[in-house]
Amino acid sequence: MKQLNYLLFLLVCLVTSIPSFAQFTINGRSVIYDKVSDTYMVSIPENAFGTDYEASIALDATAGWSNLSIEGTDIADNYTFKQVEGNKIYKIHAQEGDKEINTQLTFTFLPLLVMEGTFGYDYAQGNISLLSPEAAEPTNSFAKVKWRGGSTNTADKHKRNYKIKTLNEKGKKQEISLLGMREDNNWILDAGQIDLFRLRNRIATEIWNDFATKPYYASKEPKAKSGVTGKVVEVILNNEYRGIYSLTEAMDRKELKLKKYDDKNQEFHGQLWKVSSWDKATFWVLS
């Protein structure tokens, strides 16, 4: 049975393999396509915004594009994007055999998290790729992903939260570091459904992390944290732009440095309690 499950996982990996993104690259960075707006996106360092951004442009030899031009300028190997700004659009033209390609490009200084797969209430196989503005090469991983949440995970929600578990090529858990956060295989994508600015939850948590008192056992576990670290990212799911999310660590035993129950000596070394519903008991505790 294990062998059969492994073969099925390999088959899924072949179908949903780590994507090769680009028809072209900009300063070695992959561009990501959003089919909803017919726009390519690329993540570059924030200090490039408000400046003329000089970039080397390279076509992917396997993509079939030729005769690339940007804003009417034929591209040999480089181009200067004038006064880069958020949401500023640059017109792109190219040939793909006999087909004319007319599309557009825009820049962001937020990391781009690309997910591929068909996800729902239960875990399903897929993959993720994280493109940081500070790194030319993406971080790639197989993953299993599902929708996350209670009241935020109902049929009327237009923007889903996600739970991501990173896997290796054998379908086993694989701990990786994303955007400088802890190495783990357990990640949360928070949609900020009632946070119209998509930033308040993240900023509030960062403020908490700045002034929160260390756990009482900090002398024994100096790396214990009482708040999670997270980063703001833009998410593209199956070539469709899904908006701004907060990619965070999980608040768990690992974050709090809690030791498991000692069966031998029958000792508790710490417990983590989580609210599962907003019932009367919960409100009584919080009042």
Q: Positions of the model-derived regions?
A:
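Bacterial Sec-dependent N-terminal signal peptides
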Residues: 1-23
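Phosphate-handling architecture centered on phosphoinositide signaling
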Residues: 25-57, 63-65, 72-287
